[in-house]
């Protein structure tokens, strides 16, 4: 049995993860939660801060916000247990901190836990270099009106994957305004916030005679929870410090 502490257990994703762990993952048990809202109805105890939690566990799973990062890393260092980061909105300083922390603990991070997005991300590594010379590349990401970070972590993941796959230097733009002709080396990420959109990501390769679109639409938050719980199963026995991702969980390499 994989014992999990869930940070952000009272939020939307925390609720989905808790429910799926009980109904779809017989080998995973949420043994404790961490959240400012300690009054949520859960089958496990909830603590306000990581340092208050004295429950034995195998993996610490985070579905909260970027500002929880340092306290979670310190807790994982103290307990010598793997940490899974599923939050977004990290700053450049945060990402550097994550990189350094992975030298001390097994640290898993993914901007998106869905199987589909990770397949798309790996597909882009192959497609983008083939199309770049004759196609303009644009991205559109759409999320609900309560999402606080923009562009989404997933959109940045896809954009950076495209950039890293190309031999030429490219420039990321975030939205367009004013009067200016598009430069060849631009990759623009456009953001939509509205309603209850769970998460749509579209990568557009626009050529003179044809347009190729790669789309992913999340129609349920279950897809993120399933990926996270699979990551818990994968990370439970990891003791070696290092960086891990959904590519490791899904064994993607194409």
Curated annotation (Swiss-Prot):
A single GO BP: diaminopimelate biosynthetic process
Keywords assigned: Amino-acid biosynthesis, Cytoplasm, Diaminopimelate biosynthesis, Lysine biosynthesis, NAD, NADP, Oxidoreductase
Main location as per UniProt: cytoplasm
Pathway connected to this protein: Amino-acid biosynthesis; L-lysine biosynthesis via DAP pathway; (S)-tetrahydrodipicolinate from L-aspartate: step 4/4
Residues the record lists as binding (S)-2,3,4,5-tetrahydrodipicolinate: 144, 153-154
InterPro entries recorded: DapB_C, DapB_N, DapB_N_CS, DHDPR_bac, NAD(P)-bd_dom_sf
Enzyme class: oxidoreductase
GO molecular function: 4-hydroxy-tetrahydrodipicolinate reductase; NAD binding; NADP binding; oxidoreductase activity, acting on CH or CH2 groups, NAD or NADP as acceptor
GO cellular component, one term: cytosol
Catalytic activity of the protein: (S)-2,3,4,5-tetrahydrodipicolinate + NAD(+) + H2O = (2S,4S)-4-hydroxy-2,3,4,5-tetrahydrodipicolinate + NADH + H(+); (S)-2,3,4,5-tetrahydrodipicolinate + NADP(+) + H2O = (2S,4S)-4-hydroxy-2,3,4,5-tetrahydrodipicolinate + NADPH + H(+)
Keyword Magnesium: no
Binding, NAD(+): 8-13, 35, 86-88, 110-113
UniProt xrefs under PROSITE patterns: DAPB (PS01298)
The EC number(s) this enzyme carries: 1.17.1.8
Active site residues per record: 143 (proton donor/acceptor), 147 (proton donor)
A Pfam family of this chain: DapB_C
Keyword Amino-acid biosynthesis: yes
Compartments, as annotated in UniProt: Cytoplasm
Alphabetized PANTHER family for the sequence: 4-HYDROXY-TETRAHYDRODIPICOLINATE REDUCTASE, DIHYDRODIPICOLINATE REDUCTASE
NCBIfam families linked to this entry: dapB (TIGR00036)
Protein function: Catalyzes the conversion of 4-hydroxy-tetrahydrodipicolinate (HTPA) to tetrahydrodipicolinate.
Family membership noted in the UniProt record: Belongs to the DapB family.
Full protein name: 4-hydroxy-tetrahydrodipicolinate reductase
Species per Swiss-Prot/TrEMBL record: Clostridium perfringens (strain SM101 / Type A)
């Amino acid at each position: 049995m994989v014992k999990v502490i869930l940070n952000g257990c009272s939020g939307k994703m925390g609720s989905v993860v808790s429910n799926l762990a009980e109904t779809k993952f017989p080998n995973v048990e949420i043994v404790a939660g961490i959240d400012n809202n300690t009054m949520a109805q859960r089958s496990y105890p909830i603590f306000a801060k990581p340092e208050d939690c004295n429950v034995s566990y195998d993996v610490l799973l985070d579905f909260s916000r970027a500002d929880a990062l340092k306290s979670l890393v310190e807790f994982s260092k103290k307990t010598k247990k793997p940490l899974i980061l599923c939050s977004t909105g990290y700053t450049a300083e945060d990402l550097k901190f994550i990189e350094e922390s992975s030298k001390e603990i097994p640290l898993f991070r993914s901007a998106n836990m869905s199987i589909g997005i990770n397949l798309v991300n790996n597909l882009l590594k192959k497609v983008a270099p083939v199309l770049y010379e004759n196609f303009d590349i644009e991205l559109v990401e759409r999320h609900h009106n309560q999402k606080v970070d923009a562009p989404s972590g997933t959109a940045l993941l896809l954009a950076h994957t495209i950039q890293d796959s190309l031999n030429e230097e490219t420039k990321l733009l975030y939205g367009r305004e004013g009067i200016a002709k598009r430069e060849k080396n631009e990759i623009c990420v456009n953001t939509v916030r509205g309603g209850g959109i769970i998460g749509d990501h579209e990568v557009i390769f626009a050529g003179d005679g044809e347009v190729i679109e790669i789309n992913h639409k999340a129609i349920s938050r279950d897809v993120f929870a399933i990926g996270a719980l699979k990551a818990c199963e994968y990370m439970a026995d990891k003791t070696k410090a290092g960086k891990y991702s959904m590519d490791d969980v899904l064994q993607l390499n194409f």
